[in-house]
A protein has these predicted regions:
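Catalytic-core "active-site belt" of small-molecule-metabolizing enzymes
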Residues: 1-150, 193, 199
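Alpha-helical scaffold segments in soluble metabolic enzymes
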Residues: 58, 79, 113, 155, ...
Length: 199
């Protein structure tokens, strides 16, 4: 398997306080965990599946910290796209996890469903104001805007580039970065369908 993306988790202050951390966590995305929109996913292939909506950043340039800013992220981004993450947890009690559990569990990474439209960034797109409705079996169950992801979805991407620099690593051209959940994670059961609509 090949690394094709990176994920950032625990981007909200509430989630950080819940697991006793002061910053997000992060993990990798492998190519065999990525699906196109509309492709069914077997619920029984996962242990504790939960789904959430995120904004993805597709990089056209490397991002090497330290000192990466939101503006650097925007300049290095070919475009943004909607995605759904089906998180999974392989720890004994997924309702009571610590940051150590999350790190060992690849930031509760499961599978990723990529939206089919890449939107180039332009001066009239403010990621903080991008709105989203989240549907479960045809009924809207949640909504949100980009500002709910650390104030700006590009902020956690900058954070990750700077964090990786501490380990001599970088975000690479051609990878995508998942910026963190706009919605709370919803439990998934077999037979369910989910849809996210952005405006």
């Amino acid at each position: 398997a090949k690394i094709v993306g990176r994920k950032i988790g625990q981007t909200s202050r509430a989630m950080q306080e819940l697991v006793g951390i002061k910053e997000p966590d992060f993990g990798i995305i492998l190519n065999n965990k990525v699906y196109a929109e509309g492709v069914p996913i077997k619920a029984d292939s996962m242990m504790f599946p939960r789904i959430e909506v995120e904004i993805g950043f597709y990089l056209k340039e490397d991002l090497q910290g330290p000192g990466v800013t939101v503006l650097d992220v925007l300049a290095a981004t070919a475009g943004v796209f909607p995605l759904l993450e089906v998180k999974d947890s392989r720890v004994k009690d997924p309702h009571n996890t610590t940051v150590v559990d999350s790190i060992a569990d690849n930031a509760t990474s499961g599978v990723v469903i990529l939206g089919g439209k890449l939107t180039p960034l332009s001066s009239d797109i403010d990621l903080r104001l991008v709105g989203m409705n989240f549907e479960h079996d045809g009924r809207v169950i949640d909504s949100g805007t980009g500002v709910e992801v650390m104030g700006n979805p590009a902020e956690p991407v900058a954070w990750l580039a700077n964090k990786l620099a501490e380990f001599g690593m970088k975000l690479s051209k051609g990878e995508f970065v998942m910026s963190g959940g706009i919605t709370k994670a919803i439990n998934v059961t077999a037979g369910s369908s989910f849809k996210a609509t952005f405006d």
